[in-house]
Regions:
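Anionic, Ser/Thr-rich low-complexity intrinsically disordered regions
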Residues: 1-142
Length: 142
């Protein structure tokens, strides 16, 4: 098992795009646009690997001074509930702290709220629709 930073455009990045498509986009009938993927060049990309196989991923993007947004978190379907997501979030939080960020925010799908609450995140604001499904803003001070 290894947690590591992924380089945009690498073989690992291609695995990351494929995993996010399978878990986050395909069920909604959506695709990634080339423009969306190009914007990810400036994001911090993270993966959870078992040997060379990507089992989970997420990314951080700076949104304001001292704040990053956790985005595009995905874990292989059959491996959810085994600690991969938790390990990824903790890894991302540690990288954010090392880079002197003070807060992490996210647009969490309603179904994932209990998971993030266990990791110390709290909801902020009202529910809204994003990519056709209900979300809520969650945040955590680092």
């Amino acid at each position: 098992m290894a947690l590591k930073t992924i380089i945009h455009g690498s073989k690992e990045y291609e695995q990351m795009v494929a995993l996010r498509y399978q878990i986050l986009r395909k069920p909604l009938g959506l695709e990634f646009s080339p423009e969306e993927l190009e914007k990810e060049k400036n994001n911090l990309l993270f993966g959870f690997f078992e040997e060379d196989s990507l089992e989970g991923c997420c990314m951080l993007v700076e949104t304001a001074k001292g704040t990053v947004r956790l985005r595009q978190m995905a874990v292989v379907s059959g491996l959810q509930g085994k600690g991969i997501g938790r390990a990824l979030v903790i890894f991302a939080e540690n990288v954010a702290r090392d880079r002197r960020f003070k807060k992490i925010i996210m647009h969490a799908r309603k179904a994932s709220i209990p998971f993030f609450e266990k990791l110390g995140y709290h909801t902020s604001g009202e529910e809204f629709i994003e990519l056709t499904i209900p979300h809520v803003v969650m945040e955590k001070e680092l």
